[in-house]
Amino acid sequence: MTFKVAIIGRPNVGKSTLFNRLVGRKLALVDDTPGVTRDRRVHAAKLYDLHFDVIDTAGFEDAGASTLPGRMRAQTEIAIHEADLIFFTIDAKSGLLPDDRTFAEIVRKSGKPVVLVANKAEAKGAQGGMLEAWELGLGEPIPVSAEHGQGMPDLRDAVIAALGEARAFGEEEEGEDDEIAATEVLIGEDIADPDAEDAHTYDNTKPMRIAVVGRPNAGKSTLINALIGEERLLTGPEAGITRDSISVDWDWHGRRLKLFDTAGMRRKARIHEKLEVMSVQDGLRAIRFAEIVIIVLDATIPFEKQDLQIADLIIREGRAPVIAFNKWDLIDHPQELLAELREKTERLLPQVRGIQAVPVSAETGRGLDKLMDAVLRTHKVWNSRVSTGKLNRWLEAILAHHPPPAVAGRRLKVKYVTQAKTRPPGFVVQCSRPDAMPQSYVRYLSNSLREAFDMPGVPIRIALRTSDNPFAGRAKKRG
């Protein structure tokens, strides 16, 4: 990447829509409600032959430093400091508001090169807003429609004019594709990067994707900030600060990681606003594309019904869960509570028996190294593979000790087992009558597999297949 662009402006001028247009996918939540974006989101972007990082930011608001809008503004000011170029974005349809003038002055004082982006230029009445924009003193406004992809060639030329050709083009990375991205139709709303892989093409050099989930106000954003050692994500006492899933790249002892902060997940019955529905859906996508999911529980009120529903979703999706009992600094009798919580964990989540559960304090930093050790151990188990020879020796011993029961007077026969996949470990068991096999015996096989091959804390999939003789029927044909 050659440079970094921050998209700045008051709420609801279309910053996230422009961000999505530049990255070529619908990553940021977009809604008519002002203030949807709260954290700053960074992603690789492409504008014709220009390659750069783009930062989506919260809308600038004039507010006290200790308030939520004030803390959002502080995150935006960090983005201005990090950026090489500012896209100061206005709504040409509605024209200038007092906040546009106030924040234009802040951007001007930063001394950074600025491109004045007049968004929603396709709307009726936008011409008046375009003329007003000259009053900001930020140069010629570039008319665009982020929603429809209009005006992108002019935006590209404005970037080159602001930075100069040498800075704008810089040193191209090998093998990069110069296809036009910003004018294409946006498809999909996935949270994952395009490097999603299946079990057979897993590349250990790619960043491990870790989603951090939990109920509102459990301390998810604070935990990520504590892990990476900076105030990267907006935090505070208000529940529901995080709205869309924000990814943060991080290196832990040489291991590349991508952390996804997600919106707090409440019970469906309590979700009424469209924006919260969108936020939760965004979090669900983060889970589906993650490898590890850290479930953050508030240790002062752990194992609410919603916590268990979140854990069940993660297990059904086949992700590898790790539990973080957060706010451990508030606990008076930690040893007694830890023993109680671990017993509850085993009892309430039998599908992932042996799950890693670590007490942490995102506020003080206690337990974070142990949490990351648990993440790496769980990831290794989630990727584990057992040879067919070992599996069938195990099966032989299991059948001798505890054969499957008889059903309708006929004993079920289990003949062969092999591992079909990893991430999570999945096994195919050949048996005489798959439909008749009791689920209790399938659970027995799963628990025995987990214990015999040291696979604690991850979902194990077992598929039953018929063991029909492939040569059956030939004698009949000869007859």
From Swiss-Prot:
GO terms for biological process: ribosome biogenesis. CDD domains: EngA1, EngA2. Residues 3-167, 208-383 form the EngA-type G domain. GTP 1 binds at residues 9-16, 56-60, 119-122. It comes from the Bacteria. One of its GO terms (molecular function) is GTP binding. InterPro entries: G_ENGA, GTP-bd, GTPase_Der, KH_dom-like, KH_dom-like_a/b, P-loop_NTPase, Small_GTP-bd. The keyword GTP-binding applies. Residues 384-468 form the KH-like domain. Keywords: GTP-binding, Nucleotide-binding, Repeat, Ribosome biogenesis. GTP 2 binds at residues 214-221, 261-265, 326-329. The keyword Protein transport does not apply. Belongs to the TRAFAC class TrmE-Era-EngA-EngB-Septin-like GTPase superfamily. EngA (Der) GTPase family. GTPase that plays an essential role in the late steps of ribosome biogenesis. Associates with the 50S ribosomal subunit. This is GTPase Der.
